[in-house]
């Protein structure tokens, strides 16, 4: 069977915590249109808190539940609204594609020291220096949990 997917967001999707409610309220309409899969934006807390589009991952387990990065809700809503939206899609046989960025993190809570090398910008395998110590925000403590 061929399905039809909708990407239910774009970079400029309005915030204010309303997207998950919109998805929930439109689930039956989407099914009537023949939609079989819905691609939703990252649901977790990003470094930009309530303004994050989700591609600056801070806490992959905060779906709009904890007071972190200046907000409780994410740009798209809170955990309860998200789970209700996914359940509404499921009830009308629309699958959910969950977008999760796993290969980087942003907005560490504390600094850590570690060694780095200066490298050739055109070839990262070509070291231009001996290792030296730097300090950067790479420690995540999630104090809002």
PLM-predicted stretches and their roles:
Residues 2-25, 32-36, 40-145:
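Substrate-binding/active-site clefts of carbohydrate-active enzymes
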